[in-house]
Amino acid sequence: MRSPLVLWTGFVLAFATLSYSVRFTEGKPPKNFLYRWSTFEGNLIQFAIIAAIVYGIGGLGDRRRLLALRRPTSWSTGVRIGAGIAVGMIVLTYTLGLVLKPGREQGVTPDTWQPDHAVAYVANGIVIAVVAPIVEELLFRGLGYSLLVRFGRWPAILLVGVSFALAHGLVQAFPFLAAFGAGLAYLRSRVDSVYPGMVVHGLFNAIALTVAVSGKPQAGILHACAAAWPALSPF
């Protein structure tokens, strides 16, 4: 029987390789990417496959323990850490945002609101703000952290952050994604659960999607998301 750590590492590296290959060969997705029903269908299939792989690897051990599917040890600790993640992302945005353009590089969010395609945009938004955070938190902060913590808490946090960033296949956004991923891993390590991270992650994506079509510059999306976390998150 293969080690769950070997299988997880192999999957993350393969996914990262695929993400960067697609990015460098095909470039950015079209601006109407989130207004398409085909995007909704494709993303659902993708996350279903990832979830099945996570479920399968987790089944090689104590699945609920590996995925950290349990009640957080402390809600108040989650509040403080959530605020800390917000402050950290604000600082990172101010220091690196002028040089790096993470939102522009990813190119997923549209520049304008198209009411004729509102239903498709909302459907894609549900996938990005609900399905994606659940699956990604289970993959990285659940399974990944549980398998890597044997090497130490901080190495696990850093490795989870880096692997999370690599999986997105971006260059300029890499520092932001790695910091966000590591912050969520730290949150998971402190509250011993993936549930608070799912909420923070979901809020981040939801606010980004909302800000993208509100007329505000995309360069400020990360700033807006980070500033809103403490007020909106129940954790």
Please report, for each region that a protein language model flagged, where it lies by residue:
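Membrane-interface starts of transmembrane alpha-helices
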Residues: P30-I45, V119-N124, G152-V160, S193-P196
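Membrane-interface helix/loop boundary segments of multi-pass membrane proteins
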Residues: W75, V135-L159, Y186-S193
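Hydrophobic core segments of transmembrane alpha-helices in multi-pass, intramembrane catalytic enzymes
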Residues: I45-I50, N124-I128, F176-L184
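Alpha-helical transmembrane segments of multipass membrane proteins
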Residues: A14-S19, Q46-I50, I85-T93, F204, ...
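Juxtamembrane helix-loop-helix connectors linking adjacent transmembrane helices
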Residues: T25-T39, D62-A132, P217-F235
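Functionally important transmembrane alpha-helices
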Residues: L18-Y20, I157-A167, V171-L232
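Hydrophobic alpha-helical transmembrane segments
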Residues: L5, T9, F40, S76-A83, ...
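Alpha-helical transmembrane segments in multi-pass membrane proteins
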Residues: S3-G61
